[in-house]
Amino acid sequence: MSRSLLTNETSELDLLDQRPFDQTDFDILKSYEAVVDGLAMLIGSHCEIVLHSLQDLKCSAIRIANGEHTGRKIGSPITDLALRMLHDMTGADSSVSKCYFTRAKSGVLMKSLTIAIRNREQRVIGLLCINMNLDVPFSQIMSTFVPPETPDVGSSVNFASSVEDLVTQTLEFTIEEVNADRNVSNNAKNRQIVLNLYEKGIFDIKDAINQVADRLNISKHTVYLYIRQFKSGDFQGQDK
């Protein structure tokens, strides 16, 4: 993106809401800092992520990842193109710009997207800009989406359509998992199933205990008992 010098005579500045930010506005922007870091980790080093605060356009960049693509850092000013995207979205139903292409000062081709960050009053207080460097070799880009060459790539994920389905799918998988473990005796299977579900956080879901109790044909009080035993470190008990 080009970086026009911002002055008090810039027409765009007159269109911005000049009210000072309150603490809630700062808290909202602060919460997006983790989004910057997370997107950069997910997409890869070929993508620059910039969080702008509209409190002061002369030093609007408050969080940036992979800023080497444009030479920007925290404290850099907003760009003229970002301002244009802002004005296109101010008062509009959409808070996401169309994708657009531009060239950084270094000459690299960038594909970009700008997202407006609004407060409770729907006032735009910040911008999240995502800029992908298209001049990076394609093989380098693809390498960020390929799992490492290790035997244990990662755990499976249940993409359930509802929390009830999530509990059911996780429960059935856990039952199969415990039944296949020869180190778990028949008398201890229910207890081990509940332990595994507890470690997976499934009991944080409302009514999960009832679902588990019904499926295992035990009382919900037994499930509660097992959970208390796990929390206290006492793994003794009998299935009921």
Swiss-Prot record:
Record-level GO cellular component terms: cytosol
InterPro entries with a match to the protein in the record: DauR-like, DauR-like_HTH, YheO
Pfam families referenced in this protein's UniProt entry, alphabetically: HTH_22, PAS_6
Organism superkingdom: Bacteria
Family according to the record: To H.influenzae HI_0575.
Name under which the protein is recorded: Uncharacterized protein YheO
Organism: Escherichia coli (strain K12)
Gene designation: yheO
